[in-house]
């Protein structure tokens, strides 16, 4: 059975923090960060939520795919930073985009979460249980980071 990705969408938090700005708060420098990670800037979720960014990206993906929210039968959201424990972020996205008939749940598997979510959707499609799935990865790590820990705050946003 041929399975394909029909559309993609993205959403970035509005606030951008440079290495120079970060060096005002922790013992680091642009040179130290970029030489070790290649990172120059990161995005910080101030007003955005995991769900709001996921919903925006989902709508863009549906538009690119030429599909309506009503066509979506499965929503899998990969995140370690849900807005709430319940309802799941996927259920919130489901309501936000109007995919009322979709099965919706979250996958919490850190960096590999999106890969697991994609594989779960693939298995649902291969079994014939659904035809159209929406797989989303969305994080707001900036809300849970220790901004005094140079070992992690330079990596995530």
Go through each PLM region and give its residues.
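Short beta-strand to alpha-helix junction loop
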Residues: 53, 80-81
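Cofactor-binding loop segments of dinucleotide-utilizing enzymes, especially the Rossmann-like FAD-
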Residues: 8-10, 80, 138
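Short glycine-rich or small-residue beta-strand-to-loop segments that form or flank ligand, phosphate
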Residues: 74-79
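Acyl-thioester C-C bond-transforming condensing/cleaving domain
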Residues: 63-70, 83-157
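Conserved "HGTGT" condensation-loop signature of ketosynthase/thiolase-family condensing enzymes
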Residues: 1-73, 97
């Amino acid at each position: 059975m041929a399975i394909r990705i029909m559309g993609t969408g993205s959403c970035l938090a509005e606030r951008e923090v440079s290495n120079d700005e970060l060096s005002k708060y922790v013992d680091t420098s642009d040179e130290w960060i970029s030489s070790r990670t290649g990172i120059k800037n990161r995005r910080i979720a101030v007003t955005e939520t995991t769900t709001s960014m996921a919903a925006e990206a989902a709508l863009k993906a549906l538009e690119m795919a030429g599909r309506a929210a009503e066509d979506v039968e499965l929503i899998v959201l990969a995140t370690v930073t849900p807005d709430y424990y319940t309802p799941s972020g996927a259920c919130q996205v489901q309501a936000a985009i109007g995919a009322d008939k979709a099965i919706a749940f979250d996958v919490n598997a850190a960096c590999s979460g999106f890969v697991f979510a994609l594989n779960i959707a693939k298995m649902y499609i291969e079994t014939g249980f659904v035809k159209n799935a929406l797989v989303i990865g969305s994080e707001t790590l900036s809300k849970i980071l220790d901004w005094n820990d140079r070992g992690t705050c330079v990596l995530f946003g």
